[in-house]
A protein has these predicted regions:
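Exposed alpha-helical structural elements
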Residues: 4-7, 11, 18, 78, ...
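Short alpha-helical hairpin
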Residues: 21-31, 93-100, 135-143
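Short amphipathic alpha-helical segments with heptad-repeat character
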Residues: 6-13, 46, 50, 112-119, ...
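Short, helix-capping/interhelical loops that line the mouth of catalytic, cofactor-
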Residues: 1-7, 58-116
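Hydrophobic alpha-helical core bundles mediating ligand binding, dimerization, or RNAP-core interactions
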Residues: 16-19, 56, 118, 122-125
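Short, contiguous alpha-helical
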Residues: 32-87, 123, 127-166
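An N-terminal domain-cap segment
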Residues: 1-39
Length: 166
């Protein structure tokens, strides 16, 4: 894993730990409450973010088997990553990609269970990324549903901006 990717992962984990610490103080009734019928509860936002990261990791696991077919990342991948970042920082609303919205959310039994699942998922991602050959970090290895092919660093940047958006 490259030092830049390691720093991105460390920041993602620190941000997650801070959020989970804050939410742990809230009663269950607050975490399931929706401000309006079309808005998501805190639990639903957490599930959406987890599902998004899990789907991205599944894609990367599959695609990492074909390293020789991946294109070397260049200006276009950097531009796509920038566009994803700018778009997510804008006030525009987007439909969630299939498999990351309310249609797949499940009832949350406890905050501890949900937070434990997300932390475990992050640990698995860190382990997986640490086992990848260094050359993959220079390739267009990840396909964002709207933004197209990005590097792994671009994927982690998406995770950060997506997390901040919600």
């Amino acid at each position: 894993m490259t030092p830049k990717v390691l720093a991105q992962l460390d920041q993602l984990d620190a941000d997650l730990a801070q959020l989970l610490d804050r939410l742990m103080q809230e009663p269950h009734s607050v975490l399931v409450h929706k401000l309006s019928p079309e808005r998501w509860s805190a639990y639903e936002v957490l599930q959406h973010l987890m599902l998004s990261e899990a789907g991205s990791l599944r894609y990367l696991r599959k695609k990492s088997q074909g390293l020789s077919q991946m294109k070397k990342a260049g200006f276009r991948a950097a531009l796509r990553s920038w566009l994803v970042t700018v778009t997510l920082k804008s006030p525009l609303k987007f439909k969630t990609p299939k498999g990351t919205g309310v249609e797949v959310f499940s009832p949350v039994e406890s905050f501890a269970l949900l937070s434990g699942q997300w932390q475990k998922q992050r640990e698995e991602m860190r382990q997986f990324l640490s086992e990848l050959p260094l050359e993959i970090f220079e390739k267009e290895a990840y396909r964002h549903p709207r933004g197209g092919m990005l590097t792994i660093g671009g994927m982690l940047q998406f995770f950060k901006v997506h997390f901040e958006r919600h």
